[in-house]
């Protein structure tokens, strides 16, 4: 193989899985809304609400690790939606990728899946992805998050980056525990 053929086969720094229409919805009116869901069982009505707010456009799940397991679940809850996609963004390189940013900018709803919030902090902070997400929130598209995905939607994030974590007793005794 030539050098250009090898370069053409280079794996992208992200993973992308899409079901439903392969063509992006356009000219969709969205309504601002936020769902902050703790860990545990997903709440069907919360996802249905986000789909309604999205104008049945393109629903995007983002995460740093994991699978596309949300895709069929959300498509079943929101059968009139244009598409459901999962974008796995596991590095700073992926968080600065043109395709990732274009996909964020084309979504009518964004959901941040649960996982390890320190991955979100390490991989996404101060990247083009971070800026694009803030822009989309300001533009008023519906957003949501589960567990760690909820955590990174807030102003302050506990990520356990500096130590192995904190117990409830330690946090109650000293909320500024480092």
Where are these regions (language model features)?
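Generic detector of leucine side chains in alpha-helical contexts
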Residues: 1, 53, 60, 77, ...
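Sec/Tat signal peptide C-region and signal peptidase I cleavage site
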Residues: 3-7
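Extended, subdomain-level signal for the structured scaffold at the beginning of enzyme domains
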Residues: 8-119
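Class I SAM-dependent methyltransferase SAM-binding "motif I" and its flanking Rossmann-like core
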Residues: 121-178
């Amino acid at each position: 193989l030539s050098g250009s053929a090898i370069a053409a086969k280079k794996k992208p720094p992200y993973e992308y899985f899409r079901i439903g229409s392969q063509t992006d919805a356009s000219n969709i009116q969205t309504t601002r809304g936020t769902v902050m869901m703790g860990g545990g069982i997903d709440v069907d009505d919360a996802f249905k609400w986000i789909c309604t707010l999205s104008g049945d456009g393109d629903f995007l799940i983002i995460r740093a690790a994991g699978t596309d397991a949300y895709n069929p679940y959300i498509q079943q809850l929101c059968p009139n939606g244009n598409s459901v996609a999962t974008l796995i963004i596991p590095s700073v390189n992926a968080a600065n990728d043109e395709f990732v940013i274009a996909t964020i900018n084309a979504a009518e709803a964004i959901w941040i899946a649960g996982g390890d919030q320190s991955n979100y902090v390490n991989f996404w902070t101060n990247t083009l992805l971070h800026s694009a997400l803030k822009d989309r929130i300001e533009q008023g598209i519906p957003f949501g998050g589960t567990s760690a995905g909820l955590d990174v939607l807030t102003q302050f994030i506990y990520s356990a980056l500096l130590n192995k974590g904190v117990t409830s007793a330690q946090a109650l005794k000293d909320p500024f525990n480092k």
